[in-house]
Amino acid sequence: MNYGYVYDPARIAAAKERMTSAGFATSFDADRPHLKGNWERLKSLGVTMVLAQVDELKATGINRPSNEQRRGSCVLQGSGRSIVDKLNTMIADKSIVCEPTEVAAEVMYGYERKKHWSQTHPWGCQCGSCPDGLTGQDAAEFYATMGVVPRGIYGGVDLSKPNEQLAILWNNIGVPSNLLDVASNHKIICHASRTWDEYADAISAKHWGWICLPGICQAHSIDADNCCRIDGAGGHCTECCGIVVLPNGETAFIIQQSWGNAIKYPPTIQTASGPIQLRQGSYAVRQSELERLGTQVERHSCDIPTSSAF
């Protein structure tokens, strides 16, 4: 089964090198040194949770349900939603003045897939055997260097609603150039974190992001605090949309899946401040559970410059 995340260390390193050579920041720790130790500072002040769903509710009036992924487009789903959540946070805290906006990450997916398969399939893949999927760094490179497209209709191309099939089509024929022109007005700052402690600093500072793991979390495999265990095979990318302190003082990350109602995770988790209800499709994973996965992971976070206002 292909969940849509491709782990390719050489490709990840090459994308980071291209970004660095072009003057784009790639390291959260290096680019945001003032946030080093942010999560520990917040905990010392009594903070036990930082959740994207709180800002989403404040900015939009609702907590949107999970995306409805049907293909191996998880990098599209996880990265796109993290950018939307970051925009909602900026609207909620009044650091940007605009209407809540969804982004069409299909543009990123089609462009990056076409780019990486062009050598073996110069005129588009017709073999039917190539897997779906990208690395998490593919998405980061596109958003930082090319930008994102707000949902809407552009010259007859309807991006007003999610459309996985359009993203797959663009794997073959390429993304229309007018969409890349739109994207260039909305570039995103994307960082990678080297450790889960560093990532805790990013997420607790509300730099929501996407994580890519060599496994999936099963709804039936939970502990006493309703945290999920990673016990399923298959590379997968999901949004990371929060961080909490558990009753025993451990840290857990809040993850947002993109499979609609296909998997029903526990709606409530236990925290140091008592039980909290998560938005539909979200679940908690202990940091210690994530750390046991080793180095075959990617941890990305995002920020939106005010010059990229939607």
PLM region spans:
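Predominantly the structural core of cysteine protease catalytic domains
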Residues: 2-7, 70, 76, 80-84, ...
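Structured alpha-helical subdomains that flank or immediately precede key functional sites
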Residues: 1-98, 102, 124, 128-148, ...
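Acidic helix-start/capping segments at beta-turn-to-alpha-helix junctions
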Residues: 96-121
